[in-house]
Amino acid sequence: MLLTISDFLFLSLTFSRYARMRDSRPWSDRKNNYSGPQFTYPPEKAPPEKLIKWNNEGSPIFEMPAEGGHIEP
């Protein structure tokens, strides 16, 4: 059976020899991967640089702070 270039590209893109490898570590070693906290704290929010107000037509109006300061939300 002859493989064309398109067949070779299809096979190389759809099947990976690393996709379904068995984990050879014992269960006690694998279990240690999932111990401990499973979350991180959220990052601090950046302060807003402009204030957005909406007019009666539904269009936004952007107001910039004076002297490069930050606007409190």
From Swiss-Prot:
- The signal peptide annotation in the UniProt record is 1-14
Q: Please list where the region (Disordered) is annotated.
A: 25-48
Q: Name one GO biological process term.
A: defense response to fungus
User: Where does the UniProt annotation locate this protein?
Assistant: Secreted
Might you report a single GO cellular component term? Answer: extracellular region
Q: Which UniProt keywords apply?
A: Antibiotic, Antimicrobial, Cytolysis, Fungicide, Hemolysis, Secreted, Signal
Its main subcellular localisation, reduced to a broad class, is secreted
Presence of keyword Signal: yes
Q: What does this protein do?
A: Displays antimicrobial activity against the Gram-positive bacterium S.aureus ATCC 2592, the Gram-negative bacteria E.coli ATCC 25922 and P.aeruginosa ATCC 27853, and the fungus C.albicans ATCC 2002. Displays stronger activity against P.aeruginosa and S.aureus than E.coli. Displays very weak hemolytic activity.
UniProt-recorded name of the protein: Antimicrobial peptide lumbricin-PG
The upper taxonomy is: Eukaryota, Metazoa, Spiralia, Lophotrochozoa, Annelida
